[in-house]
Regions:
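Active-site-proximal loop/helix segments of hydrolase catalytic cores
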Residues: 44, 49-52, 56-145, 223-324, ...
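Conserved ATP-driven motor cores of ASCE-family P-loop NTPases powering translocation/secretion/packaging/pilus
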Residues: 313, 323-333, 347
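Long amphipathic alpha-helical scaffold regions
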Residues: 69, 73, 330-339
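Bacterial N-terminal signal peptides that target proteins for export
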Residues: 1-8
Length: 413
């Protein structure tokens, strides 16, 4: 067994120097080729100062999920070094990255805010400027809109913020966001809506939808409620719902490819397993819940979703985020699914202290890109250099075949 493993490792560099999944063959040491028609791109954009995922859908429609931003060091724990440098604000990095890859440069089509925590919404910092009218501070979501406007925004509460958005950790950040929503919807033409659970039509393709009838995005969870395939079920009732458990979650499906993302709705909430049951079949990829914090990514959920790729956006120097015990459990699990774990950041002090543990990961450090080939039959995973704006490929994995959809199971509606 050991000899076989050594043989595989010796062959590995030759295998991963190039990988092609549409948009041209990607080569290690060269910039990632541009998106091309029919491909689906999922980019975990790394600034080490918040979570942000940028998607280019098969016809060029764009969707951004979250745009976290903070600059001050939390008192509880240290942050990773900011990327690409300490002088460039995270939202500027997000906008620059998106403009580089998006095929239509004028504006983003959709923005989904999963919940109202600073690492997804934006923290109010003394040095951040204000909007042109002075109505609100430019931070996270609001600053990204100032840099690169989006046409529609979806969150978990609009317009019922008084009744549904009372759980946020930072009332100041939420109040700032509400002022932004009021101003932008009234004066700038921004459309706003609450995520509709069970609805596969809230994020339609904008340019050539007729070419991609097997593409859809479905609302799965929000406000502690989960779509069970027939109805919306409240999994908290009169119990205490906290902000993480209120996160929005969506399932993106394209051909045989499925991707699930749900903010911080992890195992320390009541919705992780119900979301998996709602989806009811293996997925190719997912964002880890709550930065792979303790109690997330439980075995009952993994047994249903059986992910082949797990992407974690993390930015603190902590052995519990991502949690070492969960990395170990997932890597040793006999549950089906390749469970290749990719991390935007893990500090060198942690990897040096336990190199055997972190050697189980598929990739550490950088922007993480999942590129799905036209038709949704196969995909590749790329790690990109996050130290500059050339977006050089550091690692190329795949192509991987998607799991065929069971003949007796229809796509989630």
């Amino acid at each position: 067994m050991k000899k076989a493993r050594i043989f595989i490792l010796l062959l590995l560099p030759a295998v991963v120097l190039t990988a092609g999944c549409g948009g041209g063959k990607a080569r290690v040491g060269k910039p990632l080729p541009a998106w091309s028609e029919g491909c689906l791109d999922i980019h975990a954009v790394n600034t080490a100062r918040g979570e942000c995922t940028f998607l280019i859908l098969p016809d060029g429609t764009t969707l951004t999920v979250d745009a976290g931003e903070f600059s001050s060091e939390p008192k509880k724990y240290r942050s990773m070094p900011q990327k690409p440098d300490s002088l460039t604000r995270p939202t500027r990095t997000y906008a620059r990255y998106m403009r580089h890859f998006m095929p239509y440069k004028d504006s983003l089509d959709y923005f989904l805010l999963t919940h109202f925590h600073m690492d997804h919404l934006g923290q109010l910092e003394p040095e951040y400027g204000r909007s042109a009218g002075g109505d609100y501070v430019l931070s996270g979501v609001t600053a990204l809109y100032d840099e690169l406007p989006f046409r529609e925004i979806v969150d978990r509460a609009y317009p019922a913020y008084d009744s549904l958005a009372c759980l946020a950790m930072s009332t100041a950040s939420l109040a700032n966001y509400r002022r932004f929503i009021g101003r932008a919807t009234e004066h700038n033409g921004l459309k706003a809506a609450m995520l509709r659970l069970g609805d596969s039509g809230q994020f339609p393709l904008r340019r050539r939808p007729e070419r991609y009838p097997d593409f859809r995005i479905t609302g799965i969870c929000s406000n502690g409620c989960v779509w069970d395939g027939e109805k919306v079920v409240n999994h908290y009732g009169d119990g205490t719902l906290r902000e993480n458990g209120a996160s929005c979650g969506i399932l993106l499906s394209y051909g045989d490819f499925d991707y699930f993302t749900a903010g911080d709705a992890g195992g320390n909430t009541r919705v992780e397993y119900p979301c998996a049951r709602s989806i009811g079949r293996p997925v190719e990829a997912m964002k880890s819940h709550h930065h792979l914090s303790p109690h997330t990514m439980q075995d009952d959920m993994l047994a249903v979703l059986q992910p082949d790729v797990i992407v974690t956006q993390s930015f603190y120097i902590r052995d519990i985020q991502p949690d070492q015990g969960i990395i170990r459990r997932i890597s040793e699990s006999k549950i089906l699914g390749a469970k290749r774990m990719y991390f935007t950041n893990i500090d060198r002090s942690l990897t040096d202290a336990d190199p055997q543990l972190y050697a189980r990961s598929a990739g550490i450090g950088g922007h993480i890109v999942i590129r799905v080939s036209p038709g949704g039959k196969e995909y590749c995973v790329y790690m990109l250099d996050d130290s500059d704006t050339t977006y050089t490929v550091k690692q190329a994995d795949g192509p991987f075949r998607c799991k065929p959809q069971p003949q007796n199971t229809e796509k989630h509606e």
